[in-house]
A protein has these predicted regions:
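Non-catalytic signal-transmission and effector/linker regions of two-component phosphorelay proteins
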Residues: 1-47, 51, 55-70, 91-92, ...
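Hydrophobic anchor at the start of a short beta-strand
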Residues: 46, 97-99
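Active-site residues of response regulator receiver
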Residues: 72-81
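Residues at the ends of beta-strands that form strand-to-helix hinge/output surfaces
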Residues: 78, 122-123
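Hydrophobic/aromatic residues positioned on beta-strands within the core alpha/beta folds
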Residues: 78, 100-103
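Short amphipathic alpha-helix used as the core "switch/output" element in two-component signaling
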Residues: 82-96
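Hydrophobic/aromatic beta-strand patches that form the interior of the parallel beta-sheet core
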Residues: 100, 119-121
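Negatively charged, flexible loop motifs adjacent to catalytic sites
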Residues: 104-109
């Protein structure tokens, strides 16, 4: 597998106990060297994946295989190119997993469509807004799982967070 993964998988240095696992997916090079301290301060263990770049075959999900990072995640912040289909593949493999999507604008100014079951992020430029959306999505999924709801219930709030 040619998966590109940050070397500090599920890292929260010096913190005890199980914290929600956040998978950040983004192809921007600057994020590959980020320490993600704001997400860690908000209570998440963080892993990072750069995605398949220009080779969709480099992503195990797009080949119909399991991705170990997605398997271990409690919530995903998805910022990869919408046309790759990674967000939809995540939902096919783990329909109960909340996927919060940054929505880039198309050339004519409208947002790309959000795959079924994913939650659009209204203000992706704000880290505070991202953290708030992730915390709400993870809590909604956790409550739905505790109540015995199906995956549809856990992902039903499709309004922008």
């Amino acid at each position: 597998m040619k998966q590109r993964v940050h070397t500090r998988t599920w890292s929260s240095p010096g913190l005890a106990g199980r914290r929600p696992h956040l998978l950040v997916e983004d192809s921007r090079p600057a994020l590959a060297i980020s320490d993600f301290s704001l997400f860690q301060d908000a209570g998440f263990d963080v892993a990072f994946c750069r995605g398949p770049d220009s080779d969709p075959g480099a992503c195990p999900l797009l080949r119909g295989q399991q991705c170990m990072l997605v398997a271990g995640a409690d919530v995903v912040l998805h910022g990869l190119e919408p046309g790759l289909g990674v967000a939809a593949a995540i939902r096919r493999h783990r329909p109960e997993l909340p996927v919060v999507i940054k929505q880039p604008r198309q050339e004519h100014g409208t947002a790309y469509p959000v795959p079924a079951g994913c939650v659009p992020l209204a203000y992706s430029c704000s880290v505070g807004g991202q953290i708030d959306a992730l915390l709400r999505a993870e809590a909604t999924a956790r409550h739905a799982a505790a109540a015995g709801s199906g995956p549809e219930d856990a992902s039903s709030p499709r309004a922008p967070l």
